[in-house]
A protein has these predicted regions:
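Conserved S-adenosyl-L-methionine
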Residues: 205-216
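Short catalytic micro-motifs in class I SAM-dependent methyltransferases
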Residues: 114-118
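A short glycine-rich, Lys/Arg-flanked "PGG" loop and its adjoining helix->strand segment in the class I
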Residues: 126-138
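Core SAM-dependent methyltransferase catalytic element
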Residues: 216-230
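SAM-dependent methyltransferase
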Residues: 143-199
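A conserved beta-strand element that flanks and buttresses the S-adenosyl-L-methionine
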Residues: 111
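Conserved class I S-adenosyl-L-methionine
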Residues: 1-42, 57
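Class I SAM-dependent methyltransferase SAM/SAH-binding core
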Residues: 45, 51-99
Length: 230
């Protein structure tokens, strides 16, 4: 039986899939740089692939790419794009990041972009990271990104940890999708750099390299990207 937070998350991302696709077309340069380093014979998994903005460039280079997402409607969008671009080496699976239906140590590289922070509960986030580690071959790498809590936009909400509600985790916040007439709350656990590294370490990754990226904030990082090794 699906947990309530998974059902809610699936509904949320199904509801905004078409609108999301309009505004998330450009791949992150950090991801393109990561893809450049992957062998053409690699089998790659894009966990929480969304609308495929990183999956498509990866598929154009690598042997096979598996895209997983909690949203069936996101997967439909990806499928339509692969057909349009005549890409035949992509395999799509409806799945959560916490329970990846792939065998141990079979994958050459993993992308997990802007999705870890959408998983409710620290235990579940760690579980998803451990799943990524499990499916990776030894010495293989993953790129993982999260939103930062200390941006110009969000930092005021988290300046005093003692004033934060004890009923929720420090960093938890609902951020609304308000485009195309929609007004839909999305769960986020916004990360600090230290916490991000600690979660990656707890999952068992090594050679953790974290980079902060600014988008709209002049002083503070908006995102953190980590390249990790199994």
């Amino acid at each position: 039986m699906k947990k309530d937070y998974i059902i809610e998350s699936e509904k949320t991302w199904d509801s905004i899939a078409k609108s999301f696709d309009k505004t998330r077309r450009k791949p992150w340069q950090e991801c393109l740089d990561f893809i450049k380093e992957i062998s053409e014979e690699s089998v790659v998994v894009d966990v929480a692939c969304g609308n495929g903005r990183h999956l498509i460039p990866c598929a154009k280079k690598c042997k096979n790419v598996i895209g997983l997402d909690i949203s069936r409607k996101m997967l439909v969008i990806v499928k339509e794009k692969t057909i349009k671009e005549n890409i035949s080496n992509v395999f799509l699976i409806h799945s959560t990041a916490e329970d990846i239906p792939l065998k141990d140590s079979t994958i050459d590289a993993v992308l997990f972009i802007a999705a870890l922070h959408n998983i409710y509960g620290k235990e579940n986030r760690i579980k998803s990271l451990k799943e990524i580690k499990r499916i990776l071959k030894n010495d293989s790498k993953a790129i993982i990104s999260v939103w930062s809590r200390y941006t110009n936009k969000f930092r005021k909400s988290f300046q005093n940890k003692n004033l934060h509600s004890k009923k929720i985790e420090f960093g938890d916040k609902h951020i609304y999708w308000r485009k195309d007439g929609l007004d839909i709350p999305r769960f986020y656990h916004l990360y600090g750099k230290k916490e991000f590294i600690e979660d990656l370490e707890e999952a068992g990754f090594r050679k953790i390299k974290v980079k902060g990226v600014k988008i709209k904030s002049e002083k503070y990082n908006d995102n953190y990207f980590a390249v990790v090794t199994k």
